[in-house]
Amino acid sequence: MSYLMMDLAGLTVSATETAQLQHPQVGGIILFSRNCENKNQLIELVKSVRSIRPELLIAVDHEGGRVQRFREGFSLIPAMGDILPAAKGDLTLAKQWAKECGFLMAVELLACDIDLSFAPVLDVNGISEVIGKRSFSAVPDEVSALAQQFIIGMNEAGMAAVGKHFPGHGSVAADSHIAMPVDPRTKEQVEAFDMQPFKHLIGSQQLQGVMPAHVVYSNIDPNPAGFSSYWLQTILRQQLGFDGVIFSDDLGMKGASFAGNYLGRAKAALDAGCDMILVCNDSVGVNALLTEFDWPAAEPTHTALSLKGNTAQASQALEQQTRWQAAQLLAMDITRIAQSL
C-alpha cells in the first residue's frame, strides 16, 4: 500500500520511528538538514533505515541554492536562477551547465543511497519570493530548456525527476508554508504561461513524478491544486497525459489547512489523485494517520517505489571521477560569477 512519506526527528532513528517505519502504509521518508551532521553520519542513518525497510523511497529537497538540505561533505549546488545569468544569457552554454548541475546533485545523493531529490523546480519566476531564484527563469521556454537538461543530468546519474509545483507557484506572492496563496488568473493565462514547462517535459516523457502546488486558482477551481481532482485528474492526467507519480506537498503546510486535520487532509489529497502524501515536522500527525486513518485498500495506481534510484547506473556514474570533479568546479564557478553580477 505505502501511501505515506514521513520524516525523522534527528540524526538517528528513534524507537518510535522504527515502529512507524515498519507500518505498511509508510512508503518513504524525506530527510532534512537536521538529519545530517556530516556525510558519514548521513550514510549510517540511511543504512539504519534500510535495515528496517530496505524498499523505502528515501528523498530530500536538494535543489541547489538556498534549498539544499545537506552541505557538510557535499558540493554546493548553485541556485537554478543563477545559471543563465552566469552564462551571460547564452542559453546553449547554460543548458550544458544545467545538465552538469543535475548530474552533480544526483550523483552525490545516490552515493549516500538516497533515491530522490524533489527537483527540478518548474515554476516560472514571477512575483513569488518563496520561489525566486529556485526557478530557472522568468521565461517559460527557458525554464523548459534548462530543466530538460538538468533532468538529463539527473537521469545520467541514475535518478528520476519530480517537477514542482504544478501548475505553477511563481505568480502568487504568498508563501504556502505559512499562508494560502490565491491566484485569480484564468485557465488560459495559467496554461499559456506557468504550465508550459510541465506540458513540455511531460510531452517529452521526462518527468517521472510531479508535486502540485498548495495554491488556489480561484477562477478555475475552489480547491488548492494538490487537493483538486480537476487539476490532478482532468488536467494533469487526462489533458497532459501524465503517467507518473503524484506526490502531495507537505500536508503540514498552511496551504493544506483548508482540508481540516491530518485525516481530512490525507483523504482530500488521496481522493484528488495523489499517489503519495508527505507529512513533515509533525510526528503527532504521522501517528494519527498511522493509527486512525482509513487508508485505501488497494495499492496506489502509480507507486512511488518505481522512482527508486537506479543503483547500477549510479555505480557507473560514481566511477566518472573526472566528470564529478569538473561539475564540482563548475558549480563553484556559477555561484561565484552570479555573486559578482
Swiss-Prot record:
Residues of the active site: 177, 249
UniProt-recorded Gene Ontology molecular function terms: beta-N-acetylhexosaminidase activity
GO cellular component: cytoplasm
A Pfam entry, by short name: Glyco_hydro_3
Disulfide bonds: none
Locations listed in the record: Cytoplasm
Catalytic activity, EC: 3.2.1.52
Catalytic activity: Hydrolysis of terminal non-reducing N-acetyl-D-hexosamine residues in N-acetyl-beta-D-hexosaminides
InterPro entries registered for this protein in UniProt: Beta_hexosaminidase_bac (IPR022956), Glyco_hydro_3_AS (IPR019800), Glyco_hydro_3_N (IPR001764), Glyco_hydro_3_N_sf (IPR036962), Glycoside_hydrolase_SF (IPR017853), NagZ_Beta-hexosaminidase (IPR050226)
Enzyme class: hydrolase
Gene Ontology biological-process annotations: carbohydrate metabolic process; cell division; cell wall organization; peptidoglycan biosynthetic process; peptidoglycan turnover; regulation of cell shape
Residues binding substrate, per UniProt: 61, 69, 134, 164-165
Keywords: Cell cycle, Cell division, Cell shape, Cell wall biogenesis/degradation, Cytoplasm, Glycosidase, Hydrolase, Peptidoglycan synthesis
Pathway field: Cell wall biogenesis; peptidoglycan recycling
Chain positions of site Important for catalytic activity: 175
Keyword Cell division found: yes
Homology family: Belongs to the glycosyl hydrolase 3 family. NagZ subfamily.
Function in brief: Plays a role in peptidoglycan recycling by cleaving the terminal beta-1,4-linked N-acetylglucosamine (GlcNAc) from peptide-linked peptidoglycan fragments, giving rise to free GlcNAc, anhydro-N-acetylmuramic acid and anhydro-N-acetylmuramic acid-linked peptides.
Protein name according to UniProt: Beta-hexosaminidase
Gene from which the chain derives: nagZ
